[in-house]
Amino acid sequence: MNSDGPKSGKKRREIRAKLVKKLTSDEDGSGKLVKDNNKSLKRGREGKSDVDEPLIKKPASTTPLVTQIAKTSDSYLSKTRFDQFPLSPLTLKGIEDAGFKTMTVVQEATLPLILQGKDILAKAKTGTGKTVAFLLPSIEAVIKAPPASRDNRHPPIIVLVVCPTRELACQAAAEANILLKYHPSIGVQVVIGGTKLPTEQRRLQKSPCQILVATPGRLKDHIDNTSGFATRLMGVKVLVLDEADHLLDMGFRREIERIIAAVPKQRQTFLFSATVSDEVRQICHVALKRDHEFVNCVQEGAGETHQKVSQMYMIASLDRHFSLLYGLLKKHITDNVGYKVIIFCTTAMVTRLVADLLGKLSLNVREIHSRKPQSYRTRVSDEFRKSKSIILVTSDVSARGVDYPDVSLVVQMGLPSDREQYIHRLGRTGRKGKEGEGVLLLAPWEEYFLSSVKDLPITKSSLPPIDHEAVKKVQKGLIQVEMTNKEAAYQAWLGYYKSQKKIARDTTRLVELANEFSRSMGLSIPPAIPVNILGKMGLKNVPGIRVAPGFDKKPAKRNYRSR
């Protein structure tokens, strides 16, 4: 979104960060503050799960109306003011206080259609104001809804927003609270995977809300197990599927279908997505009306990545990856005052390993991944958002939608799961029209991935000469990394690449590559893996695998009589 200037943008980010913190933790990091419709804040426990874990039948296609947004500028901003639309004066006041002046392209394109009562599928690049685009009309729907009677034991939920991850859910709720500054009677709550269900049930009963933001699995839990919740959902007038492509990529088809079945057919539905895959189009036939509109805010020929982000890749053997990363970071830190770097790793445990190593190398590093509790992740996310001269090592929990301002460099270590994930990761930089840089670091046997991004402006970078001093420092740092971290990273690495079909075809070769990764961590012998884990991976009896002692035989029968 546009604003008065840098000061108002900074102020807005600070407000949002505080609200996210309130939504996910209290003073001791163990609770949740939730704005209710009685102007008070209610507390509940936070949870620990990363995202809810898990597709869509191909119905006969229909042809929706298409709205194409043609812009001569690369900017995501438009010249349209918010007060040019019939929005509530109190909402406009909140927008003004937040420093917003003009709309983004996606907001300008979708708002008039939504206000006409249309369902929409909106495609837009990341960081272009999609969240506010669906929140503004959602708030208007709440304002226009008839007030619930005071003796109603199950006051209706008017707006239901479904997000794929807890981070996105909390961020959307924080944005909503900014816009609701002058609407104290409108309550917002968040229900997310991993929290204690009874605590959320008590909070929902004690502090009814009109806007509910949720992750799919937890929402289904409430539909199935929370008294009166299904009745409350029958009041839904607006359903939002945020990051629809990500929801489907994560296998949430059944949950989405269950959610759609639980809300009234007479409703408005908005699907917002950075990419529009066949799966997204299929879910449209289930969720949207036949006359829904497709709003494409990506210019034809503009590409799927931001043009102000330079993209390059390096091909190097695994034994050079850590020292190359260290050299890349040192150069970037030297060249960029106030640098802000995000490093994406293939798994949570590899993330932990890389963060541990960079910490041993005296870099200012933080880590976020699914194995960290939500209170920790919220605190680190907030710190990274507000800080400069900092490095965040993360798994894909930070790949989509999360808004970190002023990220100067994104490094992707190892094979992205697919083209879309590469694009979303890269989208953490170059946001709000700013410049950024992206580097993809691959091993020679991962080079096949480049064919999937050959239409993107990504160029090959030659490898720098070996910096022997840097290599020594990295080797010393790896020695200091905890052995348990190396063992967990090895097992997770093997599991991740076992899921990559082109690599996993030859299991003997896969294990050879895993052992190469083990050596890159400074280990002369690869870690042993329990036989039950190897069985689940389909890697039993593969040459080169070490079975953990004590796990390769069936447990002996216990003689209870001798006790």
UniProtKB/Swiss-Prot annotation:
Residues with the Phosphoserine modification: 25
Catalytic reactions of this protein: ATP + H2O = ADP + phosphate + H(+)
A Pfam entry, by short name: Helicase_C
Helicase C-terminal domain location: 328-479
UniProt xrefs under Gene3D superfamilies: P-loop containing nucleotide triphosphate hydrolases (3.40.50.300)
Region (Disordered): 21-57
InterPro entries with a match to the protein in the record: DEAD/DEAH_box_helicase_dom (IPR011545), Helicase_ATP-bd (IPR014001), Helicase_C-like (IPR001650), P-loop_NTPase (IPR027417), RNA_helicase_DEAD_Q_motif (IPR014014)
Covalent S-S links between cysteines: none
Comp. bias intervals (Basic and acidic residues): 23-56
Keywords, in A-Z order: ATP-binding, Helicase, Hydrolase, Nucleotide-binding, Phosphoprotein, RNA-binding
RNA-binding in keyword set: yes
Motif Q motif, residue numbers: 80-108
Sequence motif: DEAD box, positions: 242-245
Binding site for ATP: 124-131
EC number of the protein: 3.6.4.13
Enzyme category, top tier: hydrolase
Domain statement: The Q motif is unique to and characteristic of the DEAD box family of RNA helicases and controls ATP binding and hydrolysis.
PANTHER family on file: RNA HELICASE
Descriptive protein name: DEAD-box ATP-dependent RNA helicase 25
